[in-house]
């Protein structure tokens, strides 16, 4: 191969590799309870001139299993602290990450079901007895589902509720079961309960946070993540992101 042709070939190859690296888009796995809040945070992130990130919503447990099996997520924004720490223990992340928010569990009721929500145990028993189904996220996959079961047991409602439970892969799906009427009652995050889509079809009641383990939501950065993932990780800890989280009902560290 002539020298000039070889040089052109090497230069072209260098350009292709450089463009591929530059074009690498950060992929962020986000717990379903964060959907509305994260959408606003992502908009704020892009407004500062940052490149767009690819966002996938789902359950923290499913994302963790997928990352363990090689899924190319660069940043996990989890609904709890257990799954991110497990990724660190398995050598997938750069460290144990940080707690970015503390969530609140609520009960929601479909407006058309005519069920009254009250923090009176007597009224809650009436509501559960009247409900056709009660939607929760799978407790082994989603922290809000785990918290819901802890609450029901601590409040002495488990025995009357357990046979009416229907399980969803994540809290977003559990919420939609109530919105669509597949269930009359459900447990979800306050951030989802306050969203426009959900609030027009349901009403909600805050659950006593002393009756379930605090939902400390942690995020963790994977090894080899591109710069944009690191930038987003840092932005999630900014005053601007914390202000948005608080607006959606989260407490922040």
Language-model segments: residues:
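Bacterial N-terminal signal peptides that target proteins for export
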Residues: 1-10
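Hydrophobic helical h-region of N-terminal Sec-dependent signal peptides
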Residues: 11-15
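Exported/periplasmic ABC-transporter solute-binding proteins
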Residues: 23-50, 54-56, 61, 65-71, ...
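Sec/Tat signal peptide C-region and signal peptidase I cleavage site
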Residues: 17-23
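Active-site phosphate-binding/coordination module
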Residues: 96
